């Protein structure tokens, strides 16, 4: 390089460092973002340009414009006229005084550490019932995770270890009855995989070893009759297999139709 080119490169480098410092400085401290409607969307802290500390995410909710002559927010509930306000509803007034918002409801909340999710994270349904609780370490799922249906009943629970499923996992019907249960080792199914019908009767019993089908696999109809049965080894069929009609009559056996 010539002296002039070298000087130009140094200037560019200095300017880049200054601009980077300015950008980082602008992204430090408490930051709030808003939906196009003006409702609060996110609220959290930046440190050195990355998310750090508690962050909260909000549902937008409904937005109302004051079209009424009475000066009250028109929530436009079914059966109401444009100039009527349902006084049983709570709304928030914006700074300009011409827009009203539903009180903010949390959608998700959790903490960041150096830009990565850390610790307990919680999400909610719009009705404020819990939807999920999960745990993170350095941005990866680590620890228990629980999910719920909107009615409050549990839908799923299990454990992650450094981003991979481990241990016993259970899924439930919305009624609370157990739907499915299996075991994971380092992210792969290993052990029995059980399923049930909505009335609690067994639907299937299967086994995995290191993520591959293994041993006897059996499934049933809701009336209790067998539906299918086969034996596996190393992920492949091993020996005879049989399928049945719901009335108990054999449908197919060892690859030959009856």
Question: PLM features: what roles do these ranges have?
Answer:
Residues 68, 77-85:
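Short acidic, low-complexity intrinsically disordered linear motifs used
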Residues 5, 71, 101-102:
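Selective for proline/serine-rich intrinsically disordered segments
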Residues 1-8:
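Short, Lys/Arg-enriched N-terminal segments with co-localized hydrophobic residues
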Residues 11-22:
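Sec-dependent N-terminal signal peptides
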Residues 21-63, 81-84, 90-258:
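Glycine/tyrosine- and acidic-biased, solvent-exposed loop/turn segments at the edges of beta-strands
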Residues 59-74:
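Internal, charge-rich low-complexity segments
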Residues 9, 75, 105-106:
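Intrinsically disordered, low-complexity segments enriched in proline/serine/threonine
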């Amino acid at each position: 390089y010539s002296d002039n080119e070298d000087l130009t490169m140094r200037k560019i480098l200095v300017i880049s460092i200054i601009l980077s410092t300015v950008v980082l400085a602008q992204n430090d401290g408490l930051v709030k973002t808003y939906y196009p409607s003006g409702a609060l969307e996110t609220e959290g802290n930046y440190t050195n340009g990355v998310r750090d500390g508690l962050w909260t995410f909000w549902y937008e909710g409904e937005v109302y414009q004051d079209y009424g002559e009475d000066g009250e927010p028109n929530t436009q509930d079914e059966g109401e006229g444009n100039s009527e306000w349902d006084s049983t509803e709570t709304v928030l007034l914006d700074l300009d005084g011409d827009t009203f918002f539903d009180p903010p409801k949390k959608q998700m909340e959790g903490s960041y550490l150096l830009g990565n999710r850390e610790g307990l994270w919680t999400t909610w349904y719009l009705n404020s019932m819990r939807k999920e609780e999960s745990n993170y370490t350095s941005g990866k799922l680590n620890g228990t995770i629980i999910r719920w249906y909107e009615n409050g009943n549990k839908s799923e629970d299990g454990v992650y270890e450094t981003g991979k499923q481990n241990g016993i996992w259970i899924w439930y019907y919305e009624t609370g009855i157990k739907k499915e249960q299996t075991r994971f080792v380092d992210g792969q199914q290993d052990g029995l995989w059980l399923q049930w019908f909505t009335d609690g009767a067994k639907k299937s019993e299967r086994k995995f070893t290191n993520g591959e089908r293994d041993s006897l696999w059996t499934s049933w109809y809701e009336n209790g009759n067998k539906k299918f049965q086969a034996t596996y080894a190393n992920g492949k069929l091993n020996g005879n297999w049989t399928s049945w009609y719901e009335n108990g009559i054999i449908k197919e056996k060892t690859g030959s139709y009856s």
